[in-house]
């Protein structure tokens, strides 16, 4: 009888310890910050090296087609005509289909005139896939940064900014300064 009572009490203590361990894991997860955001109202601020939509400056382009040659899928479409009077190419149109683009950044890296650059824009959804084919006019528009949008609360520090320090200043604006340690 006493041996049975000892076994029962040992099993009860072991069970309580296992339940306590599980409860401690639950409490540990409750103290963590949220890993989700309320998307339309809160937006993540991408890192400095984020590869978003490509920005194109028509006036800088010399129609060398390096971007087409280095693209793994030959995506940019460059239309140009040879100007005999100036003895050089003149760009007529430039377009990129973001429905096909893999955002590798080769075109930006190898462009000799730096007329291509990556923006922080990641909202490229459309109801029709043909709307994702951006011509040189659409590529030239710079997106409105989410950090400056008064209707959106930017979210910092969910893995996009490594050493961000969030400080509250006048009003309800959130400013991030990066420490250089």
Curated annotation (Swiss-Prot):
It holds the Pfam family Fer4_7. [4Fe-4S] cluster 1 binds at residues 61, 64, 67, 111. It is a peripheral membrane protein. The keyword Transferase does not apply. Residues 52-81, 92-121 form the 4Fe-4S ferredoxin-type domain. [4Fe-4S] cluster 2 binds at residues 71, 101, 104, 107. It catalyses: a plastoquinone + NADH + (n+1) H(+)(in) = a plastoquinol + NAD(+) + n H(+)(out); a plastoquinone + NADPH + (n+1) H(+)(in) = a plastoquinol + NADP(+) + n H(+)(out). NDH shuttles electrons from NAD(P)H:plastoquinone, via FMN and iron-sulfur (Fe-S) centers, to quinones in the photosynthetic chain and possibly in a chloroplast respiratory chain. The immediate electron acceptor for the enzyme in this species is believed to be plastoquinone. Couples the redox reaction to proton translocation, and thus conserves the redox energy in a proton gradient. This is NAD(P)H-quinone oxidoreductase subunit I, chloroplastic. It comes from Zygnema circumcarinatum (Green alga). The gene is ndhI.
């Amino acid at each position: 009888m006493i041996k049975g009572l000892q076994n029962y009490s040992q099993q009860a203590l072991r069970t309580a310890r296992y339940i306590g361990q599980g409860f401690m894991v639950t409490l540990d997860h409750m103290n963590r910050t949220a890993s989700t955001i309320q998307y339309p109202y809160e937006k993540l601020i991408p890192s400095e090296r984020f590869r978003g939509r490509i920005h194109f400056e028509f006036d800088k382009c010399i129609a060398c087609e390096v971007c087409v040659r280095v693209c793994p899928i030959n995506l940019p479409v460059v239309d140009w005509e040879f100007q005999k009077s100036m003895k050089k190419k003149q760009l007529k149109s430039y377009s990129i289909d973001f429905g096909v683009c893999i955002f590798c950044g080769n075109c930006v890296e190898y462009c000799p005139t730096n007329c291509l650059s990556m923006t922080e824009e990641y909202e490229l959804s459309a109801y029709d896939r043909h709307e994702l084919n951006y011509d040189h006019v659409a590529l030239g528009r710079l997106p409105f940064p989410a950090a400056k949008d008064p209707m959106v609360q930017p979210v910092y520090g969910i893995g996009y900014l490594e050493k961000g320090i969030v400080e509250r200043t006048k009003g309800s604006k959130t400013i991030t300064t990066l420490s250089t340690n």
